[in-house]
Amino acid sequence: GGTVEIGEGEYLMRDSLHLRSNVTVRGVQGKTLLRKAPSAVSALAIDGDFGEEQITVVDPAGFAPGCGVAIWDRNAGGFHTTVARIIGQNGNTFAIDKPLMADCMVQNEAKAATVFPIVSGYDIEGARVENLVIEGNKQANVPLNGCRGACIFLYRAFGTVIIGCVARNYNGDGIGFQQSNDVVVEDCVSEDNAVLGFHPGSGSQQPTVRRCVARRNGSDGLFLCWRVRHGLFEDNLLESNGQYGISIGHKDSDNLFRRNTSRLNKQSGLFFRNETLGMAPHRNRFEDNTSENNGGAEIRIRGEVNDLTFVKNMIRDTREEPSVGILIEEHVGPVHLENNAIETKQQIEDERTADHN
């Protein structure tokens, strides 16, 4: 337990700030800045084998013990990408502190780069992060996928609390947590990241995201990945993102969304991904949300999803172009609509046949 306080200033990060169980890391609001160092990147000189704890690179410049490193090839994306710390060097061969998660083959364009989450927590519980500004320096870094990285990234980090942080300009996601139950994210801003603003995923149960802002991210503001269930998402602002304001899909059931505002996103303010019956995001409830001036239908419901509830939401488009409030596609099951205010050129476009209503 205990608290680590980080004073005012800018800190250049060559590896993650690694969270520990039941420890609070606290910065000074708006004045403690963690900046990602520019990345080095090299092709592998020889194959990295699954389970191996070293890599050999063509160009060792910029790689050194103590640096964070990611290793992948074109078949080893997602969770098959390895993120580790370099712990030793012999010429252009580097020892790492974790085994490789996949074969990374030279013939498949295997690479290593000094990219990593700037703040990370793995296999912990009860950690807390407060009042950090995290600068991803995306112009000087190669991408790291959201299954393994973000400005703040958690993996099996149960009960972690993130409060008052800014996550910006990362070449990937802003704040992401995977297989991490009972995570709370409050009063945070995720902006100008290359991909997602907030990314709860991979079976993260009972998340809470409250009073947060996601803006100008390259893809979605809030992306519920796979099996995000029994979550609470309230009083958030999702604006001017490059794809959807909110995206929900694979087995993301039984969540409550209330008093969120989704506006000026390139595509729909709320999007249900196209999932078959067993994998669809059933029984989600939306109360007192606002969706306005987004691209496409304000709310687009796809797939074989059942038992969605929309109560007292404001859905509007104040522009001159044709607009649709709610688009319900042909395979969607029951949708309950109650006391919603829909101010679009076409309020509801329902493509279902009688047997799907």
Regions found by a protein language model. Give the residues of each.
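Parallel beta-helix/beta-solenoid
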Residues: 49-77, 120-141, 155-168
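Glycine- and charge-enriched low-complexity intrinsically disordered segments
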Residues: 102-130
